[in-house]
Amino acid sequence: MNYKPLFSRALGLDPERLHFAAHSHHLWPDASFDGQVRAWAEANRFADRKWDLIFGEVIPEAQGHVARELSLPSPDSLIFAPNTHEILLRIVSAVDKAPVRILATDGEFHSFRRQSERWEEAGQAVVTRVPLAPFETFAERFVAAAQAGGHDLIFVSQVFFRTGGLFDRIAELAELADPAGPWVVVDGYHGFMATPTDLSTVADKIFYLAGGYKYAMAGEGACFLHAPPDFGPRPVVTGWFAEFGHLEGPPGGVQYRTDGGRFWGATFDASALYRFNAVRAMLDQHGLTTAMIADHARGLQARFQAAIEGGEAGGLSQADILNPVDGEAPRARFLALRHADAPRWKTALQEMNVIADVRDDVIRFGFSLYQSEEDVERLIHACARLD
């Protein structure tokens, strides 16, 4: 099946480009353009009244899409924010202990990595980081560290951004979660709409954050948080949007919503939610599910992996594939290859108008709907020129 017509605007801007960085900046489908135009039109048509429309229609629609994607029991557990860093600050501000004792890994995305390092410098947190390597034993080591206790907050990625490794022991962490501590926070940015994710059995125990920049195909500004009931009822970092709805709190004190809305911030650019809703409507119209998209990407990944292992992809055959395709198992939507020449390969490919990206000594190739089997063959041909 050829899905390129859904991305005609983005692909038409550079028809010769091979974009294999869908895990980084996913190209936007045509539907997102229509959503952006609608956001502009409604902002100017309704002006000051647009927020009634946004909170009355746009946000509930987006909440519904996320809730259905993750099998959440209620969309009311969800809020949106411009980025996950804001969400992280609000969650940690709700921990009523100092310094906050955090269990994490050495492979978290920069939003958490940098902020947690600064909290440590300021004496506001004590962070224990479990090494990802060797990844074959990581899950066992991390769960054991969590079960050992002594933490207020446990932070871990569903899919690790650099290596593409997948953590599949969330349910065991959820068993440890308690409103009195520890809290479990899952960074799902490389999992949401990349691989089917069902949170129905852990939704009352874990925080889950992700966004629209990658596999949701909606661009920046559409990050979200699922907050379990009773965890963090009064975040210190709070915006005035958290005042809307049913409120509770001490007499004369700051009042909070009792659902996920207690983590709302303040005024934000809602156009990202218009794009997200438009993209989800497009997927529904074409009967495309996350499982179907993941299967399409898996087939492309498998062919590229076979070419690497078979010596068809030039110097890439010298690299270690950190997250190889393994049957039908859930996986990242990118292949991560480690080699000292990764930065040089990325630059050489870019000169051929082939887009991948690199993290230190890891080059990543991301796959999605707008790529075809022919594109993968062209990618292999380009990589064959790498030494």
Tell where the protein language model's regions lie, with residue ranges.
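Pyridoxal 5′-phosphate
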Residues: 1-387
